[in-house]
């Protein structure tokens, strides 16, 4: 992000959203290659809104008249109005309903952001349905499309920390219903890619972060409120949400048949202990650390993606400084903890 002046402190959600949606020069260049419309499926989640606006800003900077269509059930009409204010067309659609899908316009370029995680242990059937039936419906509806599909790093088992994170060739043998449903989602995309020749890129995300949610927010909030920070899951990867969205959009260029998978996260393996101690220093608190680091953790090695599209731009230190200030100033949080401490796959 060296071409942008980053603020020392982010005071408001408007300032945060402006930073989150700044496109990289690489995205501005790439966006010119996308044929209209760019179809964004499942924009109602934590990442979708800023991804949509980032795509719009990239097209505007490129001087390129790209039509962007954001698709969601849109139970939140405020979100719908916000996207439309950025000249993003919105369509209400339930991707579990084939008839609703048939009403969507044709598109060659598709970003797939649909998923269901939390509450899996209470309602596993819903998780399996959303994570398998929806991608099957989309692949049947757009057999000639080019799809960048958001997946999850949780499809890997815990791996030895000393190895530096799972590579994309690691066997997919995770624990828990949610993680296995994510494996099934990838297999559905692979199956239809083989059946129809649909080019697909599978983006395995490890912990997107901004100031209102994310693994760094979870740790910082625990430190600030003197809650214990469990060190058992002692190491993690993370990535600034803006960088993740930038790479997801650009990953359309990596779509192939059969699909190729890419770990989507920052380059570092970070110690939870060191993160907690740094937040304690930044916020004038004492970190209440409990437990001891296990030899394994949920980690991914992003070298394959970085070699093709470059490393994420946002430094860890900048994210931590912003988050510490945000929490001290009582900035709004989404109240959606990542549960990064979970080691048995039960979300």
Question: Which residues are covered by each model-predicted region?
Answer:
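Conserved glycine-rich Rossmann-like NAD(P)H-binding loop of the short-chain dehydrogenase/reductase
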Residues: 60-78
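Non-catalytic terminal and boundary segments that flank Rossmann-like NAD(P)-dependent oxidoreductase
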Residues: 1-39, 61, 335-347
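Short alpha-helix in the Rossmann-fold core of NAD(P)-dependent oxidoreductases
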Residues: 123, 128-135, 148, 181-182
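Conserved Rossmann-fold NAD(P)-dependent oxidoreductase catalytic core, especially the SDR/UDP-sugar
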Residues: 37, 109-112, 117, 133-177
């Amino acid at each position: 992000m060296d071409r942008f002046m980053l603020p020392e402190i982010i005071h408001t959600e408007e300032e945060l959203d402006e930073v989150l949606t700044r496109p990289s020069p690489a995205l501005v260049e790439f966006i010119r290659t996308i044929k209209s419309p760019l179809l964004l499926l499942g924009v109602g989640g934590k990442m979708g809104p800023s991804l949509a606006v980032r795509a719009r800003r990239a097209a505007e900077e490129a001087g390129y008249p790209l039509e962007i269509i954001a698709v969601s059930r849109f139970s939140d009409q405020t979100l719908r109005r916000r996207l439309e204010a950025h000249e993003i067309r919105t369509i209400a659609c339930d991707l579990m309903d084939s008839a609703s899908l048939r009403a969507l316009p044709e598109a060659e370029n598709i970003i797939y952001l649909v998923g269901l995680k939390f509450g899996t242990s209470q309602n596993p059937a819903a998780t399996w349905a959303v994570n398998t039936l929806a991608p099957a419906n989309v692949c049947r509806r757009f057999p000639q499309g080019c799809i960048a599909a958001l997946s999850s790093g949780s499809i890997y088992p815990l791996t030895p920390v000393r190895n530096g994170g799972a590579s994309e060739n690691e066997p997919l043998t995770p624990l828990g219903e949610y993680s296995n449903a994510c494996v099934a989602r990838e297999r559905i995309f692979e199956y239809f890619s083989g059946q129809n020749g649909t080019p697909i890129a599978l983006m395995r995300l490890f912990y997107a972060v901004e100031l209102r949610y994310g693994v760094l927010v979870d740790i910082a909030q625990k430190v600030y409120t003197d809650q214990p920070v469990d060190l058992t899951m002692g190491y993690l990867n993370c990535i600034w949400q803006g960088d993740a969205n930038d790479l997801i959009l650009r990953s359309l260029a990596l779509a192939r048949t059969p699909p190729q998978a890419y770990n989507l996260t920052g380059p570092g393996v970070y110690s939870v202990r060191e993160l907690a101690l740094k937040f304690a220093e930044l916020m004038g608190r004492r970190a209440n650390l409990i437990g001891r680091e296990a030899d394994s953790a949920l980690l991914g090695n992003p070298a394959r993606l970085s070699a093709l599209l470059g490393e994420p731009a946002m430094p860890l230190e900048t994210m931590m400084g912003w988050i510490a200030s945000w929490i001290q100033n009582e900035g709004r949080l989404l109240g959606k903890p990542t549960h990064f401490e979970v080691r048995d796959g039960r979300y």
